[in-house]
Amino acid sequence: KSADRLKVTLPTPRQTTATGMETDDEKTAAPVTSPDKKYTAFIKNHNIYVKETATGKEKQLSLDGTLGNYYSAYIRWSPDSKKVASCKIRPVEKRYVYYVESSPSDQLQPKLHKQEYAKPGDELPFKIPCIYDVETGHSVIPSTDLFSQQYYITAPEWNSDSQAITFEYNQRGHQSTGYWNFLPQQESTPVNR
């Protein structure tokens, strides 16, 4: 009788990003074309830029991005192509947990895998959703009072009318989680809490 084998499927970096714990790939995502195809948004020197498709002219939207407080390359265009949304990220030193896959199906030698794993009390990455008007460069950044104790915040998504972004917020300790609407004209408000 053959022994039963236990197979453990480890998350890929993309899956880990969904939990808000892995932020390295937020620096290197591909440029994003606007819905009307007139612009491309991208990260350069830790800041958000847009480039006109027709002329190649670049315009810097954010001015305060640094290595220790940078803008995510996961940029979302509003459906009307007038604004972009992203998150400003304060990264932290990461801790990892390691797993040994003792009997991989594709080779004889064991494989070592690692996954980012913050311990209780460790500082976590901090994200602030933000909106930039492409034409004027005007920025709208919410007060972080309502989500200062974040475990994670997802990348913002635009509502179909281009008037607000929605993001998921999970409080550290998981006592509070929900979706938030951020309207540039108003404060952030909880939805479905």
Can you name each region flagged by the protein language model?
Residues 5-6, 13-18, 61-64, 68-76, ...:
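Predominantly five- to eight-bladed beta-propeller fold
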Residues 22-25, 66-73, 147-153:
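Short glycine-/Asp-/Thr-/Trp-enriched loop segments that recur within the blades
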Residues 30-39, 43, 74-83, 155-165:
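Blade-terminus and WD-like Trp-Asp/Gly-His loop motifs, strongest in beta-propeller folds
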Residues 38-40, 116-123, 168-172:
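Short consensus segments that form the blades of beta-propeller domains
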Residues 45-49, 93-100, 126-128, 174-181:
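Structural motif
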Residues 133-141, 146-171, 184-186:
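Long hydrophobic segments that form regular secondary structure
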